[in-house]
């Protein structure tokens, strides 16, 4: 590839205002923290708030290591034109990132067929498209916090929960035609024809409700509350819509179906030492995250599809899960941003895509052998490392060894998965890249960064049921992955790459793919990077705000 065509050059020139090839630079000439408009804003805000805090000291960037001795870099969000400050990519400062997680956590999918069978077989009540529509109207009153069965019940202010609703989807085209379009997630309209047929075949004639519990519920309570909130309102809505007696025995079957038997949560329950219930980030399988991201519906570019999943996963797993839930700190942001800013991973991945197209014929064109893994991963890894050698500004951009290791290995893994259509081959491309990188630089990142990479190849084909799980079924709680940044989002992207290569409509669960194709969601899951950029530019309007119940401000 011509050096001047590197995708990351524009970003590097804007970040540093120097020739990216220049080997020498200056320090202590940038004005310290004052070079950053956002830091100046932080200081001004903190000074005003000290009095409100009763004089308790507050934010002071002069405490600790001197900030701004080097260039405080802005970041170009990859595949966009947005140039943003690093602070605005911290999830606490980015409403879009928060809503990305809110929209996942507040989602629960519930099968309707068990409840319909109870109605018809136990109670002798006919279920028709008309009664389903009546039920859907009822649940859209009850789910946000409206009362339906009892008097003297307090209710939730609608302006607090405007984002809450329920919809329905089915693989049965005849039934879908009869459902009120306000309540339907229309597979035929939202997916390309070939993908729609794959999904409908997988779903069959079954019918599912998607509950979007209020964002505010997830914030005040937790992910484990979501299915319970949904189930309670489902039960009340069935009682109301089908005029049932609240105390009869069959109601217990509705409760069991809505809370347990027919419930699909976005994340599995975690062990006690993680102290989290269902629908929390640590339980989201990589295949599930790949299905949550919707780029494959709207883009024919398999690299773009993969990179959007990487960005989503890096933000959720590295920034929120490991950086927040698990470590309790404010760091880890730059582990994630390395994968979705400045077009660097994009450049490495498109290089790999061009390589496999010329050598093997493109996506899903070669069997997943170790020779193939070694060839592709080595080629892409050496390309990436050569860029760090050639452009010192690139080295400064990815100032940490584990940033460079993660980005280079992600490109190697994605490319290998694209060529083979196999996620296991892809993750082995990642592992090999890490080992090659360590040979090249004698180190990667912090102590223990590459623990999982040293043993990963052997584990990837293990007979032990947890170690040998397909990449789609692994997640942040998989053995060796549980507390290590700079890996998990990339694994999710490698998962997507394999399925993009094969033209699959979904990676793991077609129900989740359909649920997040819903255009009524607050966050646009077709383009996570663009949404993160909107959040950084303060253009994104989130849900879950409390303005209706607090003084004007």
UniProtKB/Swiss-Prot annotation:
Binds 2 coenzyme F430 non-covalently per MCR complex. Coenzyme F430 is a yellow nickel porphinoid. Methyl-coenzyme-M reductase is activated when the enzyme-bound coenzyme F430 is reduced to the Ni(I) oxidation state. It holds the Pfam family MCR_alpha_N. It catalyses: coenzyme B + methyl-coenzyme M = methane + coenzyme M-coenzyme B heterodisulfide. Coenzyme B binds at residues 228, 259-260, 273. Gene3D superfamilies: 3.30.70.470, Methyl-coenzyme M reductase, alpha/beta subunit, C-terminal (1.20.840.10), Methyl-coenzyme M Reductase, Chain A, domain 1 (3.90.390.10). GO terms for molecular function: coenzyme-B sulfoethylthiotransferase activity; metal ion binding. Coenzyme M binds at residues 335, 447. The modification 5-methylarginine is found at residue 274. GO terms for cellular component: cytoplasm. GO terms for biological process: methanogenesis. Its EC number is 2.8.4.1. Keywords: Cytoplasm, Metal-binding, Methanogenesis, Methylation, Nickel, Transferase. The keyword Transferase applies. Its cofactor is coenzyme F430. Pathway: One-carbon metabolism; methyl-coenzyme M reduction; methane from methyl-coenzyme M: step 1/1. Its main location: cytoplasm. SUPFAM superfamilies: Methyl-coenzyme M reductase alpha and beta chain C-terminal domain, Methyl-coenzyme M reductase subunits. Coenzyme F430 binds at residue 150. Belongs to the methyl-coenzyme M reductase alpha subunit family. Component of the methyl-coenzyme M reductase (MCR) I that catalyzes the reductive cleavage of methyl-coenzyme M (CoM-S-CH3 or 2-(methylthio)ethanesulfonate) using coenzyme B (CoB or 7-mercaptoheptanoylthreonine phosphate) as reductant which results in the production of methane and the mixed heterodisulfide of CoB and CoM (CoM-S-S-CoB). This is the final step in methanogenesis. MCR is a hexamer of two alpha, two beta, and two gamma chains, forming a dimer of heterotrimers. This is Methyl-coenzyme M reductase I subunit alpha. It comes from Methanocaldococcus jannaschii (strain ATCC 43067 / DSM 2661 / JAL-1 / JCM 10045 / NBRC 100440) (Methanococcus jannaschii).
